[in-house]
């Protein structure tokens, strides 16, 4: 209570105090970052190149979004009766999301890898697509997924994945989540340069 000299209240006064509280003002994790647009024409150019060159996985974009990197790839796999030896893939830092555009396939996933062997640092996939990781002979107690057009699947970093059968082909858009930023950046200009190469 604050006293007033001419009131019936106490004639003494308390000093006036103002409480100041620190406020946590939310800030974006990526300050001033532009959006990255990819046209269907550009994606189709990657698909055409993949089919013509039998090139399975191509990075379309890889961008910094603040606390993480995000990449978009176009993947096209031809018919597969059975997998090649030691073709289970695992990525240490990069998680992947597949959205199937066309075709169908059987994919096995799981974290318990059998006879895993590190990929060399010079491997093109390690350098350009999904960072350090391993290949393995098989997946112990793996889960089987029957993928078809329209489906999506999330494969966390450290989870092995293996296509055991591809009926005719499978084409999917790949989203890579790269929190440790192990994958090199690729912007629109770099993409155009890549596509222009013969």
What are these regions (language model features)?
Residues 20-92, 185-193, 197-198:
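A short, N-terminal "cap"/entry segment at the start of jelly-roll beta-barrel domains
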Residues 89, 95-99, 144-145, 152-153:
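His/acidic/aromatic-lined binding-pocket segments of jelly-roll/cupin-type domains
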Residues 92-107, 111, 122-133:
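Short, conserved beta-strand element in jelly-roll/cupin
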Residues 131-141:
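Short, structured beta-strand/loop micro-motifs enriched in basic residues and often containing a Trp
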Residues 146-160, 164-166:
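Conserved metal-binding segment of the jelly-roll/cupin
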Residues 168-184:
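A short hydrophobic beta-strand segment most commonly corresponding to one strand
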């Amino acid at each position: 209570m604050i006293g007033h000299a001419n009131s019936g209240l106490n004639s003494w006064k308390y000093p006036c105090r103002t409480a100041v509280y620190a406020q946590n003002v939310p800030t974006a994790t990526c300050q001033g970052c532009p959006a990255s647009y990819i046209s269907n024409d550009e994606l189709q150019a990657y698909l055409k190149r993949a089919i013509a060159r039998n090139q399975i996985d191509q990075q379309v974009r890889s961008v910094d979004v603040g606390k993480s990197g995000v990449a978009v790839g176009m993947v096209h796999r031809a018919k597969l009766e059975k997998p090649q030896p030691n073709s289970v893939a695992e990525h240490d830092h990069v998680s992947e999301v597949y959205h199937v555009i066309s075709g169908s396939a059987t994919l096995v996933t799981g974290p318990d890898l059998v006879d895993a062997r590190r990929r060399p640092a010079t491997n093109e996939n390690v350098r350009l697509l999904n960072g350090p990781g391993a290949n393995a002979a098989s997946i112990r107690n793996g889960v089987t997924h029957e993928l078809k057009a329209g489906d999506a699947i999330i494969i966390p970093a450290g989870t092995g994945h293996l296509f055991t059968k591809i009926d005719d082909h499978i084409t999917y858009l790949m989203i890579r989540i790269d929190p440790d930023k192990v994958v090199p950046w690729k912007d629109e200009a770099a993409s155009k340069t890549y596509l222009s190469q013969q």
